[in-house]
Amino acid sequence: MAPSHLSVREVREDEKPLVLEMLKAGVKDTENRVALHALTRPPALLLLAAASSGLRFVLASFALALLLPVFLAVTAVKLGLRARWGSLPPPGGLGGPWVAVRGSGDVCGVLALAPGTNAGDGARVTRLSVSRWHRRRGVGRRLLAFAEARARAWAGGMGEPRARLVVPVAVAAWGVAGMLEGCGYQAEGGWGCLGYTLVREFSKDL
């Protein structure tokens, strides 16, 4: 499917349940890889080992003392990602959310934007997800191009000194990172825990 066969418009009320499921599916595809990446870093392994050792004095089961800290840590990572990306945000200062729609009317992607925290930060992508049945068909690039156009228009209307778009990407989402780098984005910082990055932020001056 060529990108020219796609249109982008604001989500309709009757489409919101479908879009919400798309967002949840997108998070589910990456949360296990992010959790694995986070919990195999040396500081995390050290903390898990210390927690397991402490629990062995409280719990009668060695296996439970070993697995409980891992289960709780994985759950915390998953809940954090779901809270951040697994819900449909309300309309923001840049409008939206928007959906990518095929000519047949099938919703195949979702996008949401928000202004940056400080003046000059530009716009931020807060949601970007493509249905697993429509990936590698130009949907992500079409949504990204639409986001860039909205960011430029918003920056001009607000008198911002520059038009800029920031896209956060989970560390395990190599396909999205590759697409952004191919479109001229550069990784600049991110956030995580214990000194290790879990989400990288890609930015581009438009």
Swiss-Prot record:
Record keyword Nucleus present = no
Where's the N-acetyltransferase domain?
55-206
GO cellular component terms given for this protein: membrane
Q: Which organism is it from?
A: Macaca fascicularis
Main subcellular localisation: membrane
**What GO molecular function annotations does the UniProt record carry, in alphabetical order?**
DNA binding; N-acetyltransferase activity
Concerning Pfam families, the annotation shows:
Acetyltransf_1
Biological role stated in the UniProt entry: Probable acetyltransferase. May act as a transcription factor regulating the expression of coproporphyrinogen oxidase by binding to a promoter regulatory element.
Task: Give the EC number.
Answer: 2.3.1.-
Keyword Ion transport found: no
The subcellular localization recorded is: Membrane
Q: Which domain of life is it from?
A: Eukaryota
What is the name of this protein? Probable N-acetyltransferase 14
